[in-house]
Amino acid sequence: MSQFAREIVRNAIYNTSSPDADSVSLRKATTTILLIGVTYCILVGIYRVTLHPLAKYPGPKLAAVTRLWHSYHLCTGDIVSVLSRAHEAYGPVLRIAPDEVLFISSRAWDDIYGARPGKPEMDKDTPLYKGPTAPHSIVTVDGELHRFYRRLLAKGFSDAALREQEPVIQRNINLLVEKLHKEVAAGKTPEMTAWFNYATFDLIGELAFGETYGCLENSHYHPWVEMILEVMKLRAMTHAVGYYPWIFHILMWFVPKSLREKFVTHRRYTHDKVQRRMDQKIHYKDLTTNLVDPQNGLERYEIDGNCSTLIIAGSETTATALSATLYFLTQNENAKRKVIGEIRTTFNNAGDINSISVNQLKYLSACMNEALRIFPPGPAVFPRRVPQGGDFIDGHWIPGGTQVGIAHYCINRSRRNFVDPDKFIPERWLGDPTYQTDDRHAVQPFSYGPRNCIAHNLARLEMRLVLARLIWEFDWELAPGSERWEEEALVFNVWSTKPLMIKFTPVAR
């Protein structure tokens, strides 16, 4: 720039000879800055939808330009229904953000989440796992540390350990049934999402810490359990804004202080529970035996973080699966009649229902699988990041650094994978030729690969035992007001559902 031009600019901006000149100069400077900013955003947007390496993958244009589209739907709770419709409109490969692509083919499970011999693992290097509110645990760490935590925890979820834990499981189920009989005798209509949460939180509390929360005994949520359910929803919000670290702390100030304090309280409660567990002598191998064993050398924050994850992952999701199975059986009277017949002709009394005998209930297992398909407990995307250098996913080249994933709800409800995907049809799991083209490998409710849910055996056992016992004890139907339970559910990483009111009638024997 010439000396003359520099002098003109200097005078335009810094000349203070008159107030009018100052005002004009300020307006000019502000306008220039705004124009530069707007022009930059427009150019970035054009680049992202035309020249960006992911530009060839279809999806909403706004999503290709800015992640705000994705974050908005995370916060409103309609994310999985929006993604499902987008997959229907754009196809099996869907761009949902400038740097994120989703898939709905079963092959993508292997490419993204499966073991990758000779290739680096697709890490959980995303705000969902690395955000400031994420605990340090088996879910969030990578590599050798994850494998170490998994080896320690696996012993508590082994078949041998589950056999040792069965008396604890049966005791909690007996109490659930007893309480439901009392509710029915008092003329009440139980809200089953709450009752299933009471049971699963009490059970995981006893298996992890050696003591229940007293939810079943007191017929209401323990304050800590209520807080956990709220914290889970807030985690979805922090996930949404975690993509904007430069404004994260500002945005968090808009979260009510009482809700922010729940994170701190949750950590304190976890710490106190762990301490009581460490002071106890448990006479069976529970879920935390190896975590608290000094010989394994874990730091206290590692023990607390993994215990916190056990409580959250081992309770609400199982309760959701139980609620979904009970609900969808009311939507298919033929399936309901079949599962009732199977259970009530297999057992002579409630005492016959145990961890061994429930394995012969093939139709009940099909009902569970179908409920897990149509209403997966973890319906959203649990993303991974493509390693540097890029890789092929389902035959598509994806650049390194891109977030990729599968939304369970979307892959399970896709017409590309299932006949009548929105219908609850247990027979699709029993060899019915009508559904022989179904891609059952697409359904992975407990995730997939070396980082799948370590507690899936416990969750399935709980479901079989609870459902078999309830169906043995009661006839049931939906109470008025719960007909749209599925349609009214929202997703904040996990489901947020309306009350599920069930009218129970004890079986006369």
From Swiss-Prot:
Disruption phenotype: Impairs the production of 2-oxocyclopiazonic acid, but accumulates cyclopiazonic acid (CPA). It is found in: Membrane. It comes from the Eukaryota. Keywords: Glycoprotein, Heme, Iron, Membrane, Metal-binding, Monooxygenase, Oxidoreductase, Transmembrane, Transmembrane helix. Its EC number is 1.-.-.-. The chain crosses the membrane at residues 31-51. The keyword Lipoprotein does not apply. Belongs to the cytochrome P450 family. Its main location: membrane. It is an enzyme of class 1 (oxidoreductase). Pathway: Secondary metabolite biosynthesis. Its cofactor is heme. It comes from Aspergillus oryzae (Yellow koji mold). Glycans are attached at N15, N306, N412. Heme binds at C453. Coiled coil: none annotated. This is Cytochrome P450 monooxygenase cpaH. CDD domains: CYP60B-like. It is a single-pass membrane protein. GO terms for molecular function: heme binding; iron ion binding; monooxygenase activity; oxidoreductase activity, acting on paired donors, with incorporation or reduction of molecular oxygen. InterPro entries: Cyt_P450, Cyt_P450_CS, Cyt_P450_E_grp-I, Cyt_P450_sf, Cytochrome_P450_monoxygenase. GO terms for cellular component: membrane.
